[in-house]
Amino acid sequence: KASKLIRLYGFTLGHQMMIGLPESTKLDEINTAKALIKLKPKIVRIYPVLVIKNTPLAKEYEQGEYIPLTVEQAVDRAKDIMQLFNNAKIEVIRIGLQNTEEITDPSEESSQVIAGPYHPAFRQLVESGMWYDEIVQKIKKFNIKVMQVTIKANPENINNIIGHKKENV
């Protein structure tokens, strides 16, 4: 009801979604994304759960009751969710938390993050993973058997096609 009212009164409806919450599965998160799509937001944000110092989740993590996603698991889940939003023509305006003095690599002294899928280029990992999956799917579909493939693409997509640190090449 609140989402309808927000749109009715001319406000931009945006939703935020977290992946990797305690006991949440990939299927749970896909179903959450589908439920959000039905609410017709204009924009969404996708955040992976990070374990922050001195929080109830940190206590669960320290007691072995919560196991955070790895970066790879979070990227895998975010790729599928982003694809759902893209297919529904809903703009994903952020993926991953913005790097700050407190939200940074857990190895940094000032970081409040003690565990979880932190990566400063999380969105690029997701988008380049989506490009990689699509290109591999096309290569398989057309049964391409050569060792080298030339891909022509819009220059704005080149970084994601190549991948973070050239991981797709």
Annotate the PLM regions:
Residues 2-147:
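C-terminal scaffold of the Radical SAM
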Residues 3, 161-169:
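Short, non-transmembrane amphipathic alpha-helical segments
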Residues 48, 96, 153-155, 165:
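Active-site proximal loops enriched in glycine and acidic residues that flank catalytic Cys/His/Asp
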Residues 53, 157, 168:
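Short phosphate-engaging motifs
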Residues 121-127, 155-162:
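Short, glycine/charged-rich beta-strand-loop motifs at protein surfaces that mediate ligand recognition
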Residues 142-160:
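Short glycine-rich, basic-tinged beta-strand/loop micro-motifs
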